[in-house]
Amino acid sequence: ASLRLDRYRAFLVRDLNQTIYHQSYALRFRLRHMPRRGEESVYTGTLSGLALGHGTIRIDMDSVPNEREGVTILLRNPVSPEAWRYSREHSKSLKLESKDLLDPLVDGVNQSPFELLMPFVFWDATYEKSGRVAGRPAHVYRFSCPEWVREAQPSWVRITLALDDTYEAPLRVETFSNRSVSHKIFLLNSLKKIESTWIVKTFDCKNRADSSNTRFEVLSAALQLDLDPILFAPEGLGRELTIPPEAFLSTK
């Protein structure tokens, strides 16, 4: 079981120097926030990286509240998380603190950069059990929260991760406080095969406190791209991510 987790850790931070060509990707996505009561809100954007599953991620939001133009977020190095936020309106890039990873990706939604970067995978881990999660055989690991998380979220005690037995991909992530019931759940809903590659199509991020759900849905995908690595560096966040529309294949 520990070897399985070690393999997944290594996959997230693998060296791309030898395999960077034709590995880049871009996913057009929709964030749909569904509160228990009230109106839904929808945001769109592009998530991209130098290789699927790697721990360097760029997120270009088309529009966000309180900004006339969209913003770009760079996440990297889940072992020691780093993040930057670039405002196209102000042409300025700001390095974020670790605790900022826990803030919503967009005001009012459940999804945060934390769920996308998954730094907890590298925290102290304990194997809990095997069983079925989302209808699939899985292995569940428990992670203790480090000091920077406890300072930002004092109620958080532990996080659990369910890895698929066959594909070694995350099926479910749960965040626990002192209670035995999780207060936040990240759940994989569906996958989609684009040509010969399986990608995530939808996952939910549920908040038990207010019974809301934010659904991340991939609308189209462009794979096997050659993207300039500078796009995934802090100094390159002001550069536009330009990908021909015909490169995107629908997930419908």
Show which residues each predicted segment covers.
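Flexible, processing/modification-adjacent segments and terminal tails
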Residues: 2-11, 20-21, 39, 67, ...
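Extended lipid/amphipathic-ligand handling interfaces
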Residues: 13-14, 45-51, 76, 187-193
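Buried hydrophobic packing residues in well-ordered domains
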Residues: 15, 27, 59-60, 91, ...
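A short, Trp-centered hydrophobic/proline-enriched beta-strand micro-motif
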Residues: 18-36, 57-59
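Beta-turn initiation residues at beta-strand->coil junctions
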Residues: 31-33, 61-63, 85-89, 145, ...
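Amphipathic hydrophobic-ligand
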Residues: 39-44, 180-183
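Mid-chain, structured segments of secreted extracytoplasmic proteins
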Residues: 46-80
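Gly/Pro-enriched, hydrophobic low-complexity segments
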Residues: 105-107, 111-116, 134-233
